[in-house]
Amino acid sequence: MTDFRTLDDAGPLQGKRVLLRVDLNVPMEGGRVTDATRIERVVPTIREIAEAGGRVILLAHFGRPKGKPEPKDSLKPILPTLSEKLGRPVAFGEDCVGEAAAKAVAALKDGDVLLLENTRYHAGEEKNAPEFAQALAANGDLYVNEAFSAAHRAHASTEGLARLLPAYAGRLMQAELDALTKGLEAPARPVIAIVGGAKVSTKIDLLENLVAKVDMLVIGGGMANTFLHAQGKDVGKSLCEKDLAETAQRILAAAKEKNCTIILPADALVAREFKANAENETVTVDAVPSDAMILDVGASSIATIDGAIDEARTLVWNGPLGAFELTPFDTGTVAVAQHAARRTRAGQLVSVAGGGDTVAALNHAGVGEDFSYVSTAGGAFLEWLEGKELPGVEALRAKA
């Protein structure tokens, strides 16, 4: 993934109109930003371009306005937080193309920052319509993509635009691509992957790709129950996709063929109620009571996973090992996350994690800052793990 151009290749930025595609899809409540993480992560690139004398023109989507203006999906309420985090005023353009955009861009001086309105206010964005991409390109001299989280979508502002102007990866995109290369494309071996979450059905492609690429695969969360069921074990009232038993067996057979060691829970924390601090007990997976649910991995399984991490040099993690939102069913996820963080801090492990629940789980364990890289890109991270090409990245690669 090193064959893409970055800001280092862009030459002098003084006086250049830089169309910078960012991810500003932040949670809002009552017209205020409730979590500014995504804004904070793009600030360094905005600042770098502005300080080099570039005229920064921010392109972003927000919500799902279905190709026409929706007041609730306007980017305008983000302005105060963006200005505050950036430490400089940010102008606003009432549209991302046409006369309103052209006027706002024409008013810029070197080092100024402008946020244009939601790209999804136009149907051409999600259709990747050439004429819409050209209308966006009319306001820029070069294009920088900083939105890895939208890179799995071939939209006008992520893919079409990159074909029309000199295109570069922003610093956040660059960090993400470097981390992903270390994670799966050119990893230090052995590689261990941890895949959790509720359903096998949403992660079939992911599991099938990983068994061919990693040396050890830990399967946890609700999806592990489907594998245990496929092995003939009674999982009681646990979440289980019984209709996917054959799929699970196929994945287990593929792993065997590829010499990938599958690690499934040997014991589990079970309860009869799905609530915090429900009465619980640890049992082996051969002895799950018929009226109980598996809600976390047990102590023996935690020790096995920790031991496997000790053997590995690279870890890729997607999805929690149990119902981590409820105490004490967060024990497995927290213990394993903290163990991986210790190995990472000691320089013995490269750890890459991603996906919404995964980020929340690592933060819950207090180790969000300790992994080598934590991706905030849900869908794009998953599609990369599935081995799929990401149009937004390929468009940068094609220019190299």
From Swiss-Prot:
Any Gene Ontology CC annotation: cytosol
Gene Ontology BP terms: gluconeogenesis; glycolytic process
Positions annotated to bind ATP: K203, E325, G355, G356, D357, T358
Keywords assigned by UniProt, alphabetized: ATP-binding, Cytoplasm, Glycolysis, Kinase, Nucleotide-binding, Transferase
Keyword Transferase: yes
Catalytic activity: (2R)-3-phosphoglycerate + ATP = (2R)-3-phospho-glyceroyl phosphate + ADP
InterPro entries noted in UniProt: Phosphoglycerate_kinase, Phosphoglycerate_kinase_CS, Phosphoglycerate_kinase_N, Phosphoglycerate_kinase_sf
EC number from the UniProt entry: 2.7.2.3
Pathway: Carbohydrate degradation; glycolysis; pyruvate from D-glyceraldehyde 3-phosphate: step 2/5
Subcellular location: Cytoplasm
Binding site for substrate: D23, L24, N25, R38, H61, F62, G63, R64, R120, R153
GO molecular function, one term: ADP binding
Pfam families referenced in this protein's UniProt entry, alphabetically: PGK (PF00162)
Subunit structure, interactors included: Monomer.
Family: Belongs to the phosphoglycerate kinase family.
Protein name: Phosphoglycerate kinase
Source species: Methylorubrum populi (strain ATCC BAA-705 / NCIMB 13946 / BJ001)
